[in-house]
Amino acid sequence: MKRILLKLSGEALAGEKHTGFDEATVTVVAKQVKQLVDAGTEVGIVIGGGNFWRGRTSETIDRTKADQIGMLATVMNCIYVSEIFRSVGMKTAVLTPFECGSMTKLFSKDRANKYFAHSMVVFFAGGTGHPYFSTDTATVLRAVEIEADEILLAKAIDGVYDSDPKTNPNAKKYDEISIQEVIDKKLAVVDLTASIMCMENKMPMYVFGLNEENSIVKALNGEINGTRVTV
């Protein structure tokens, strides 16, 4: 049985609205994940908070407080998305590294494994629980903790390029690249802390574009033209 950690950006959930939620987009994601779960794959999910908050762009708010707001944004995202998942027939749980009253459960590896054993999709919200760590780092941390086989990194672009394809029409896309090359070339697939954690813990990633039809299922099966990041 395969276990994956899927990272979704908050912006992707907003669709063309660019903020908040686009229910049609989230429902498309949910139906794809249900295909994976029905086929026996164990799925953990981390969601960014960029559809609500970009703390690093604020010049007036203390960084620690800004990051805490970002953590809460990811909790809102995970609660919302988990309910959409339930509406299409999946069992879900939302785990956080800090207490949120009755809204979530406190994260532990044992608790996550128990939920996976019951075919539940497990959402890891709240980042690492500490400021100065991104949701990229939280993604790798949780993937390592739950012993995932790989990370599926769903992005707005369809893979890893040697430069920004939005500004450079001649940007070269990689079919496969090592995490060491990503670090050496400063390609910013994920941030440096997350990259080093991947390398040290031998956690592979597959980077792909979320917008392609059935992209998550195709990414798991190696049927999409993304970028494999090896370790």
Show where each model-derived region lies.
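C-terminal catalytic "cap/lid" subdomain
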Residues: 1-231
